[in-house]
Amino acid sequence: MVNSWRVQQAAREIRAGAVIAYPTEAVWGLGCDPWNEEAVDRLLAIKNRSVDKGLILVADNIRQFDFLFEDFPQDWIDRMASTWPGPNTWLVPHQNLLPEWVTGVHDTVALRVSDHPQVRDLCSLVGPLISTSANPQGRPAARTRLRVEQYFRGQVDLVLGGALGGRKNPSLIRDLATGNIVRPA
């Protein structure tokens, strides 16, 4: 992957604890380092979102989630791999390998391997990221940079320019253990 200077700048900011806004497949997202509690707390405060709800982790390839899959049946891994990269988010058991500020009150965590080039480039530099829609709780997700700036002026550390991926709807969310759809696309 060839990382643009903008993506490299965003990666530096994330490593320093920043909360950024960036384009994804369907809507703008907010993201930060999932291991940085202060950054996640800021992101949740910006969105006015409860920590109990949990957050999605996005990556550039399935290997970035290998630490979670050690005890998974191979058919689970194959099922996820067959849908990635793409607009599929899977709820998987986190086995207490992630902090509560990422998982909320759930026994599962939401994982996605993005097919958006900028998101993949960014994750290739920093690893998995928090990815949540760029909107205050209860408001429509931002579909333009202007809306991101209207919602979050002065609250995010960086807005990574770029185009959305062309999808109409956010990703489908399914439970890996049951196959049940939790959120349709």
UniProtKB/Swiss-Prot annotation:
Q: List the disulfide bonds.
A: none
What EC number(s) has UniProt assigned to this enzyme? 2.7.7.87
Q: Which GO terms describe its cellular component?
A: cytoplasm
Q: Which residues form the YrdC-like domain?
A: 4-185
User: Cellular location of this protein?
Assistant: Cytoplasm
The family this protein is said to belong to:
Belongs to the SUA5 family. TsaC subfamily.
Q: What does this protein do?
A: Required for the formation of a threonylcarbamoyl group on adenosine at position 37 (t(6)A37) in tRNAs that read codons beginning with adenine. Catalyzes the conversion of L-threonine, HCO(3)(-)/CO(2) and ATP to give threonylcarbamoyl-AMP (TC-AMP) as the acyladenylate intermediate, with the release of diphosphate.
Q: What is this protein called?
A: Threonylcarbamoyl-AMP synthase
What is the protein's species of origin?
Answer: Pseudomonas fluorescens (strain Pf0-1)
Taxonomy of the source species: Bacteria, Pseudomonadati, Pseudomonadota, Gammaproteobacteria, Pseudomonadales
**What gene does the UniProt entry assign to this protein?**
tsaC
